[in-house]
Amino acid sequence: VAYLILNKDLPNTIELRKFEKEEKNNRELSKNLYEIIKHMPKKSHPMDVARTAVSVMGLEDKETQDSSPEANMRKALRIFAKTPTALAAFYRIRKGKKIIKPKKNLTFAENFFYMCFGKVPQKEIVKAFDVSLILYAEHSFNVSTFTARTITSSLSDIHGAITGAIASLKGPLHGGANEEVMHMMNKIKKPENALKWINNALKNKEVVMGFGHRVYKSGDSRVPTMRQYFGKVAKLKKDKKFEKIYDIVEKVMIKEKNIHP
C-alpha cells in the first residue's frame, strides 16, 4: 500500500522486495534524534513527538536541500521507515524502559509492536493493526492532506509539509477523534453504564465523538472493516467490554439521531 501511494501503481515481486529492503534499512534513527527524544517531557503527546521527530529528520537528512521528485521519493520512504521507531522509542522512555532498536527481519507492523513491547503479539492482532494502517494510509482530500499540499504549494520541503500535516492530524476533529472515542469508552467504564451514559449525553446536547462525518452521511466506509477486526481482537483477548459499549452507543445514536459512526 505504501508503494502504491508513492508510485501510483502496485509493485511486482522484485519491486516490492526492493522497497521492503529500503524501508527496513532506513528504520534506525540517528544518535542525535534518540537523545532529543530522551529529553522530551514524558507528558508529551505522541503526535507532538512524531511532529518534532519528523522536523529533526529534516534537519539531518542528507538530501534536505534537494527537492527534486526523485529526492522527495527517497525522503518520503525514510520518513515512513523512521517515524514508528521514534514513536516506539518515546513510548519506552515514557514507561521508564530501555529503548528497543528496530529489527530488519520483521514486517512494518510487527516491528512496531516489537519496539514498543519487546515481542510480537499474535498474528491476529498484528493483522488488525496492519488493516488499520492501510485504512488510514490514504483518505482522499482530508485536512492533513490539504495542509501538506498547502505547504508544498510554496515549494517548501517535504519534512515541513509532513510536520504540518501531523499537527493537523492531531486535532480532535480529524485523526484525534479516535483518541477522544477511547476517552469516552474509559469514562463509560463498563457495558452496564453505556445506555445511561449515552442517553444523558444526548439529553445534555453533548458531542459524542466518533459519530457523524462531513462527507459520509450514512457512515464512514472504513467502519465495517474495523468493526470486524475489533470483534476479532476482543474475542482473542477474551475481553468484550469495549465491544459491547460500542454496540450500545452505536445503536442509540442511529436510533435517536440517525448518525452513524
Positions of predicted regions on the chain:
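Hydrophobic alpha-helical bundle cores within soluble ligand-binding/oligomerization subdomains
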Residues: 1-261
